[in-house]
Each structure stands twice: as C-alpha cells, then as structure tokens.
Amino acid sequence: DIYLYIFENDKVNVEEMWKNIENIRKQDVEAEQSSVQKYWIKYVKEHINIELKEENSDYNKKFNQIYKRSILLFPLLTNKETGGVAAAVEVDENLTQCGRYGYCWPRDAVFITRAFDKLKMNKETEKFYKVFCKNTQSRNGMWEQRFYTDGRLAPCWGYQIDETAGVVYGVYEHYKVTKDKKFLKDMLKMCENAVKFLCIYMDNILGLHDDSDIVKNEIEKTYHTENRNKLPVSYDLWEM
C-alpha cells in the first residue's frame, strides 16, 4: 500500500486534489523506486572520499556500512533552501515525543559541516555559512542559541557563547580545506562582527569593563565576576 500525505489541503479544492491523486496512481511505482535507488547509489559514490576497506571481515563490512549510511544521513539534516543544518533527524513534527534536536544550533552545525568537507560536500558547507549564518546573525554580531532550519528563531533558554565562537572557527576550518580566498573575503565582515561581540562578552564576564550590553545582566545573575579569577578552570562546552 502507498499512503499519501496531503499537505495544506485547504489551499486546493476537492476536485483538484483528486486529480493530483489520480496522476500519482498512474505512475509506475517500480520505475520510480528504481530511479530513486539509482540516484542514491550515485550520490554515495560521488561522496566517498576514502579508500573503503576490503570486506573480508565483519569489522570491515560494518565500517563500510556506517560510512555509507553517514553519507545518506546528511542530506536529511540539510535545508536546501537556506543551508541550515539540523542537529539530528526528528520524525515527530510537533517535537513533543522526541529528543527535540530537529533544530539548527550553529555550534552543532559547524561540526557537521566539518564532516561535510570530509565527504566532498563543500557546497553544502558554503551554503551554511554564506546563506544561513549571514541571514541569522544578530546586529550585534552574535548568533542565538538555536534556529529552525529555515532561519526562523527557535525557542531558547539562555545564550551560549560557543554558538558564536563556533561559527568563526568553522569558517576558518572550511578555508583550510578549500584554500578559497574568495570565500574567506565573503565571510570577513560577518566574522569581524562576531569577534567584536565575543570580545565585549568576555570583557563583561571577566569584569574588565563596566559598560553594559545586551547580555551583561544575564551574566551578572549567573557569575560573581569580581571573584571570577579565583574560580577553578572548569566549564562545560557551551560555557566556553
């Protein structure tokens, strides 16, 4: 059986809906399945960037399988229109019965784009930085905690500095792979604004300046900045 999901059916009349269903029913399902299969086999071959192991052991077979499945996974995470990259695939559209990772955290996406580069998915990496990051950067240079992959701001519960720092790091890591100076120039203004924000943010945390910005009040509620230097060096990744 084939089940059809009718999306936004309130925007078409019933007759038009049935015409669409009839057109779908006329399609050769086996031919469509074969076409899809050929597409993804070709896709995997195009992105294999290592010499796969000879499958003479269970370990090697498993290694090759995981590698190929990883290639198939990444397109499911990526929004082709915006370049946004979700942290994980979610099947629960309401995000109530799941891990709630179907969002784009800039920090997480940066590390995923590093995997993109290792799989010859450089275009996907560049779209993330050139389109998604540019469109979601705040006026003060920061990136918020998380977004929907279409670029809309998602619910947040607190600022995490590595969301911003990670993007600057990721831009340079991608440049080291491609050596594309034009990409670096395109990213320069965005990264300069991000670094300026990071300097202000850290000055506030360390108590080096009294000038307040949009995150200072939140920082002061969390940290005793005057005793900051006396605290042991211990932090979680998202507090970097």
Tell where the protein language model's regions lie, with residue ranges.
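Acidic/polar, glycine-enriched structural segments that form the non-catalytic walls/loops
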Residues: 1-100, 181-183
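Aromatic-rich carbohydrate-recognition surfaces in CAZymes
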Residues: 25, 32, 36, 101-208, ...
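C-terminal ends of transmembrane alpha-helices
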Residues: 77, 81-82, 200-211, 223-231
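Generic secondary-structure boundary/loop-capping signal
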Residues: 82, 140, 144, 158, ...
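Active-site-adjacent structural elements in folded domains
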Residues: 87, 91-100, 150-155, 213-218, ...
